[in-house]
């Protein structure tokens, strides 16, 4: 448990909540319900074993913070609890609620034990894959998905490894549970991208040989079907830049060809290549806090993922071709 003041608001609360959800208990010494709620929250912090952290803020001593949070949520009484996730206040409740109701509240925002283990296994698998220990990485990713089927990044990493091993059937099976999220008005770009990746791998064996496609393109640079098929073959085996080079040739000559299929596939490849933004660390916010003493920002600062020069280069190429 930590006590929050204006001095450590950014470093301990905002930056800290980027690592683990933090439940802020706004209380006062004269408040009877606050005294009843406090021990319940402390017990829950112990029961949840690190899945969230409890912080306390004395409303009498820290009126600026308490006032801004109360205004933000339209609350005028205490005890008032606000949960911070990823540097942001996302939800809250008022009053000394029963333990069961507080658990329901926490479970909406706090990762399950399985989700935490799944995330750790995903990170370990990424390192194993980078070290060439593919079999061990596959085992860990399969276990990570079993623990938390909602761990999309574990699913994507598993799809990548399976396709790299030339196993599109298994990759398609891993993709199937999220396939519905790749279509319709609310289609998710990252899910759609991996759907195109799997489809490319499934269709590649039925396409004409690369040597034949290359000859057709040499004879007719506007043979977009041959060029797209060649791009699909490159995409299927992870030759991403080669695939985008072929797609770019189509886009530069006919942006609208086949309902913008070349552009859509190009964007999908960029998405597959892009790593998810890592969790923000506390260091930038801590450094910023030293320069911002006395200034209260309810929303936290976040890191921007370091740029991949290859991805940046191909984004620029696409932009130039389109505009």
Where are these regions (language model features)?
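Structural register within alpha-helical repeat arrays
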Residues: 124, 158, 195, 230, ...
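Short coil turns that delineate tetratricopeptide repeat
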Residues: 149, 182-186, 220-222, 238, ...
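A short beta-strand-turn-helix
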Residues: 3-22, 218
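Thioredoxin-like thiol-disulfide oxidoreductase module
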Residues: 6-14, 42-111
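Conserved redox-active cysteine motifs that mediate thiol-disulfide chemistry
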Residues: 26-40
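Alpha-helical linker/edge segments of TPR/alpha-solenoid repeat scaffolds
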Residues: 166-173, 189, 194-211, 268-315, ...
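TPR alpha-solenoid repeat register
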Residues: 154, 171, 188-191, 226, ...
